[in-house]
Curated annotation (Swiss-Prot):
It is found in: Cell membrane. This is Uncharacterized protein AF_2214. It is a multi-pass membrane protein. The chain crosses the membrane at residues 41-63, 78-100, 141-163, 178-200. The keyword Transmembrane helix applies. The lineage of its organism: Archaea, Methanobacteriati, Methanobacteriota, Archaeoglobi, Archaeoglobales. Coiled coil: none annotated. Keywords: Cell membrane, Membrane, Transmembrane, Transmembrane helix. GO terms for cellular component: plasma membrane.
Amino acid sequence: MSQQIDPQQIDPELKSGQIKVLLEQYKILKNEIHLTSQKMTGNIRIGLIVLSLIGSYILHSLIKNEITKSVIDNTTDAVMYTISILLIIGLWTNVFSSLSAIARLGGYLIYLEKTINELIGKNLMIYESEFVPKFFTGSAILAYDLPNVLVFGCTSLFVISFLGYKVLVTINTPDFNLILRSFIILILVISTILFLVNLFTILRVNKVKDEIVTFCTKKIK
């Protein structure tokens, strides 16, 4: 904990300059958090699209032996493989892009921490133990949300696909409309999961941003 200094003894010009530096770095940090959260939610969407395709392809593969085979089976296989490969490439490209964004965010966090530490003990009476953990908590949230979401999405899709297959086998009616309805239900379930995951992620990121705004507003006045 740094020694507190009487505000009356602070050089106003020096204080103004230091606050300006802090605010400029805060603006950069806030922008990076926004961009990173956008990238992460984009990856969540792409990841769930890939997983939905994989899930629907597994479902298709499991039930196609019970349906009259035709040329459309081979065409469907080719389309599914092509789209899946393209989306997987897109997913991993965005994952590495997000990791790069998180690395930049970490760099700004360290730089801002250094700036704040220079202010500690000089004039603003900011304490490292009170300030820094909030930023690194936000960084950790952004870094760990995507893997958790993908694991959750993969597990959910496996269960949904398995249950869908069991329902089709139980009904035992090789009806294309039934398969189509099952696929639509699968997409609706995935869309619901996607909505809830994105909402949860956005709320968490916004909560961290609100904490940062509140803290900075109180400390630099």
